């Protein structure tokens, strides 16, 4: 039931939303039902939920596998830019799960698994793409850091622990885990230190590549349910990895130079391009990556062979970072606005303030990953003070606030009052 209150001698009744509890003065519209009221904000929230559920049901095609266009459409809701990488991933994931859906139907042709390698700078969306793909297909997902992995028998994390994590995300349902997605980050950090095979044992570099080969290609892994090291008296869960999709990602710093050097060797003669490879953006160079470049970088041939699909991501420019701040469903600006709404305060960012935040992230070379730390630093004092203040209706963030030369503007319900002077 909605609440109705009489304020002192005021004869007017105040109506409240039956769902969120906001009064008619705090919302644009309050719609009356037989015994309840609903505000425009709750109506919009309900519409978002319905749209999301409709999209999830539409994402299933006749065979139960979403089409590449449907996958790309959902990726667009969460990941800004990176059109080429999203297109490659959409096709690869569609083909992978179509292969599983038709397994055993056509025995004359056996379709092999195609794992994926994502190459792009830090903070460009590699991890988010992998997480979103798992959400679209509704399969278990786990993420591993390649830098913590070692060969079996050495101190560190065994590669089979990756499969254990996948099992845990599937609530130990082996059948579901066998259709899951594994994302291995920082894969470039396990590259060989030189082009020549290592003389000494490299247990965290080439050794890890060797250890990953079997589970990526397809094997029956014996996984201890409780994790840790194996011992003979222990019971094991048998997990077939041949249907698990492995997506590996890394920044591959320095790979552009290897590609550029290869380009210089071939750009000779009258028909050669006059533009220097160095003049091109790193993203354009990365898109020309060949398996031989990855071998020179330090990945072993067998490992490169297990990753036949290459998707490259580009550095995010200022425009893309501003879009990331404001447009996706989980956009940072929307998240902080919701936090401020809980204090009944509206949070407003000027357009030039958002661009200043984006420029800061570019200067720090942290990509989209650095946006949250910048936002936290800007809003820290405000979030500390706000719960103890009364009557604040709106907080405005300008470019000067981002630069640190001014305090946020506090607008009060009864009067407009600036919190602090123009200079900090």
UniProtKB/Swiss-Prot annotation:
Keyword Nucleotide-binding carried by entry: yes
Binding site for ATP: 121-128
Segments traversing the membrane: none
Gene Ontology CC: one annotated term: HslUV protease complex
Binding site for Zn(2+): 17, 20, 39, 42
InterPro entries on file: AAA+_ATPase, ATP-dep_Clp_protease_ClpX, ATPase_AAA_core, Clp_ATPase_C, Clp_protease_ATP-bd_su_ClpX, ClpX_bact, P-loop_NTPase, Znf_CppX_C4
Domain spans labelled ClpX-type ZB: 5-58
Nuclease is among the record's keywords: no
Subunit structure: Component of the ClpX-ClpP complex. Forms a hexameric ring that, in the presence of ATP, binds to fourteen ClpP subunits assembled into a disk-like structure with a central cavity, resembling the structure of eukaryotic proteasomes.
NCBIfam families, sorted: clpX, PRK05342.1
Record-linked PANTHER family: ATP-DEPENDENT CLP PROTEASE ATP-BINDING SUBUNIT CLPX-LIKE, MITOCHONDRIAL (PTHR48102:SF7), ATP-DEPENDENT CLP PROTEASE ATP-BINDING SUBUNIT CLPX-LIKE, MITOCHONDRIAL-RELATED (PTHR48102)
Function description: ATP-dependent specificity component of the Clp protease. It directs the protease to specific substrates. Can perform chaperone functions in the absence of ClpP.
Family statement drawn from the similarity comment of this UniProt entry: Belongs to the ClpX chaperone family.
Name used for this protein in its record: ATP-dependent Clp protease ATP-binding subunit ClpX
Organism: Chelativorans sp. (strain BNC1)
Protein's gene: clpX
């Amino acid at each position: 039931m909605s609440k109705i209150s009489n304020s002192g001698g005021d004869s007017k009744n105040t109506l409240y939303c039956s769902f969120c509890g906001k009064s008619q003065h705090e919302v644009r519209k309050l719609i009356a039902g037989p015994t309840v009221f609903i505000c425009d904000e709750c109506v919009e929230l309900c519409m978002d939920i319905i749209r999301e559920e409709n999209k999830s049901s539409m994402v299933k095609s006749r065979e139960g596998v979403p089409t590449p266009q449907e996958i790309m459409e959902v990726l667009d809701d969460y990941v800004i830019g990176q059109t080429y990488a999203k297109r490659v991933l959409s096709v690869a994931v569609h083909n992978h799960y179509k292969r599983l859906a038709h397994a055993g139907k056509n025995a004359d042709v056996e379709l092999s698994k195609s794992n994926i390698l994502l190459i792009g700078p830090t903070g460009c969306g590699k991890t988010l793409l992998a997480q979103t793909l798992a959400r679209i297909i509704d399969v278990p997902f786990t993420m591993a850091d390649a830098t913590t992995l070692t060969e079996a028998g050495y101190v560190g994390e065994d590669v089979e622990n990756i499969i254990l994590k996948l099992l845990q995300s599937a609530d130990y349902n082996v059948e579901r885990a066998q259709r899951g997605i594994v994302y291995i980050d920082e894969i470039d950090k396990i590259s060989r230190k030189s082009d020549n095979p290592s003389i000494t044992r490299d247990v965290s570099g080439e050794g890890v590549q060797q250890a990953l080969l079997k589970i990526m290609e397809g094997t029956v892994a014996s996984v201890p349910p409780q994790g840790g090291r194996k011992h003979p008296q222990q019971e094991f869960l048998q997990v077939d990895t041949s249907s698990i999709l492995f997506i590996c990602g890394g920044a591959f710093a320095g790979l552009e130079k290897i590609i550029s050097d290869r380009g210089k060797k071939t750009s000779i003669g009258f028909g050669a391009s006059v533009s220097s490879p160095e003049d091109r953006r790193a993203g354009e160079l990365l898109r020309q990556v060949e398996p031989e470049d990855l071998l020179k970088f330090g990945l072993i041939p067998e490992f490169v062979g297990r990753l036949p699909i290459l998707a490259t991501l580009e550095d995010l420019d200022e425009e893309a970072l501003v879009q990331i701040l404001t447009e996706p469903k989980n956009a940072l600006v929307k998240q902080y606005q919701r936090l401020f709404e809980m204090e009944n305060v509206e949070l407003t960012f000027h357009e030039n303030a958002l661009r200043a935040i984006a420029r800061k992230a570019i200067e720090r070379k942290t990509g989209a990953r650095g946006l949250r730390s910048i936002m936290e630093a800007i809003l820290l004092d405000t979030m500390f003070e706000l719960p103890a203040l009364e009557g604040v209706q709106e907080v405005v963030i300008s470019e000067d606030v981002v630069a640190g030369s001014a305090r946020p503007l506090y607008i009060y319900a009864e009067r407009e009052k600036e919190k602090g002077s123009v200079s900090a």
